[in-house]
């Protein structure tokens, strides 16, 4: 598929999942054409409903590799698809505002909506998590959930080599602390551009 169609597919997905509003359409499309280094954009009518953005992101990543924007490694793909999704993410203040409004009405619904947003933004990589093998076993202390984690791919030797070249830094302080919101990441630190915290 043409990259223009993939951009339109992602914008359609983001609107359906309420990551962006109608008013954000051109702002987000312009951010996407910048990240994907394409000069043109033409709005298209898209009629599809997807559970996650993974199929769209896969096409965009393949495009980025063909264009020489990234190398074909797991880490480069993860860094780049997070950068792509950041183009359709609400700002942290908007996420907090929505959460607080929802929480005032129904705390569980607020948490559920935040979780759905985390899946829609690909922060929670549901397509990978669904590959995990999970079962329950009864113990004297109650049921125990056992998971074989297949969602974390093996590191590519090229990614390991790049990580060795990254200058050591104390910023951000940890993988989940506040200063990660919007952090682009690098070979030694995952991208956190879609990371949102509720204080």
Model-inferred region functions:
Residues 1-198:
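Active-site microenvironments that recognize anionic phosphate/pyrophosphate groups
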């Amino acid at each position: 598929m043409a990259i223009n169609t993939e951009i339109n597919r992602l914008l359609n997905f983001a609107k359906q999942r309420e990551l962006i509003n109608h008013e954000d359409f051109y702002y987000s499309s312009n951010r996407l054409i910048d990240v994907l280094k394409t000069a043109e954009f033409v709005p298209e009518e898209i009629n599809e409903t997807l559970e996650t953005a993974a199929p769209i992101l896969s096409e965009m990543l393949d495009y980025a590799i063909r264009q020489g924007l990234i190398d074909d490694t797991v880490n480069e793909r993860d860094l780049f698809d997070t950068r792509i999704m950041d183009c359709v993410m609400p700002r942290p203040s908007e996420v907090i505002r929505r959460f607080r409004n929802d929480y005032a009405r129904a705390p569980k619904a607020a948490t559920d909506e935040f979780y759905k947003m985390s899946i829609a933004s690909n922060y929670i990589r549901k397509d990978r998590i669904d590959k995990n093998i999970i079962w329950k076993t009864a113990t004297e202390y109650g049921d125990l959930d056992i998971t074989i984690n297949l969602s974390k791919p093996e590191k590519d030797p090229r990614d390991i080599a790049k990580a060795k070249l990254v200058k050591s830094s104390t910023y951000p302080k940890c993988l989940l602390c506040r200063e990660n919101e919007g952090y682009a990441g690098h070979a030694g630190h995952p991208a956190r551009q879609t990371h949102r915290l509720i204080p």
